[in-house]
Design a protein with these regions (language model features):
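Membrane-interface motif at the C-terminal end of an N-terminal transmembrane signal
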Residues: 22-28
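Bacterial N-terminal signal peptides that target proteins for export
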Residues: 2-13
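Bacterial N-terminal signal peptides
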Residues: 11-22
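Compositionally biased amphipathic helical and low-complexity segments enriched in hydrophobic
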Residues: 3, 16-18, 115
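Periplasmic c-type cytochrome electron-transfer domains
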Residues: 28-270
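Short intrinsically disordered, low-complexity coil segments enriched in acidic
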Residues: 1-2, 174
Length: 270
């Protein structure tokens, strides 16, 4: 088993990471300053570093030995400034949390691509003319870390829509508002379903192709990729390969300590 090296280092990468949220040593700090710092370069300091969470700390391991920030995962293919990383933040477990969303909102006054009205607000028709309006418009994202997914009732649904009572005045049978937290693009080789509801799983299609379809649809739906901007098979392959090489797991528990010591096999390398 590979052991995580715990050491202080100075590295550069084009990513927003927490300064004191990542820690090294025998125990996590008493508290975390989540203020992001901007770093630049090709490879990031994520590999082998431990980021605090509610029960201790977790770490990311890529089978390539580093997380490549030049990968298509970190590039924008749409029209609204988003990348995959917008909703899949490494320091927050490759997803978003209310704390991370609030941090981004406060730093950008709610103008970050994360808060685009196509799915970052409670309704696509909501008012975003002022910071107060933007805060109200993205309340589900700010308070619960949830992205709005608009889907029609599927033909095979085992239910019928009897009535609509939407406080945000948008949902209908043609566009249900489903609020969900983005799933981490890590530990994917262990999965047999893509998406919360499995809608990217198609009969006779491999998991690789399911993931490629998900990446393609994400750039269309969440990043608002234009119809004429076709993604090549090489780009989709790059994203899927990147994701399937990522593994994430708890490395430190507040009660048990380091999970790879005293015979323990904790951590993403396991």
């Amino acid at each position: 088993m590979l052991m995580i090296r715990r050491y202080h280092c100075a590295v550069s990468a084009t990513l927003l990471l927490a300064g004191a949220a990542a820690f090294v040593g025998n125990a996590p700090p008493a508290q975390s300053d989540s203020k992001p710092v901007v770093i630049s370069g090709d490879h990031d300091p994520i590999q082998g570093l431990n980021f605090r969470d509610e029960s201790g700390a977790f770490s990311t391991f890529s089978t390539t030995g580093h997380v490549d920030l030049k990968n298509a995962f970190f590039k924008s293919f749409g029209t609204n400034g988003r990348t995959c990383q917008t909703c899949h933040q490494p320091k927050f477990g490759w997803t978003i949390t209310p704390a991370s969303v609030k941090e981004v909102f406060d730093d950008t006054r709610g103008r970050d691509p994360l808060f685009r009205s196509n799915d970052g607000t409670n309704s696509p028709e909501t008012d975003q003319s002022s910071i107060q309006a933007r805060r109200r418009a993205s309340s589900m994202l700010l308070l619960k870390g949830l992205i709005r997914v608009g889907l029609p009732i599927p033909p095979i649904a085992e239910f019928a829509l009897a009535d609509v009572d939407d406080p945000y005045h948008h949902a209908s049978s043609a566009d249900l508002s489903l609020f969900r937290r983005p799933l981490p693009p890590a530990n994917l080789p262990f999965l047999n379903t893509v998406m919360w509801d499995g809608r990217e799983n198609k009969a006779g299609r491999s998991m690789h192709d399911n993931l490629a379809s998900q990446a393609l649809n994400a750039t269309t739906i969440h990043a608002q990729r234009s119809v004429g901007n076709t993604l090549s098979p090489e780009v989709l392959q790059s994203i899927v390969t990147f994701e399937t090489q990522l593994f994430m797991a708890q490395t430190y528990d507040a009660h048990a300590g380091w999970l790879d010591q005293n015979g323990g096999l904790g951590g993403p390398q396991s």
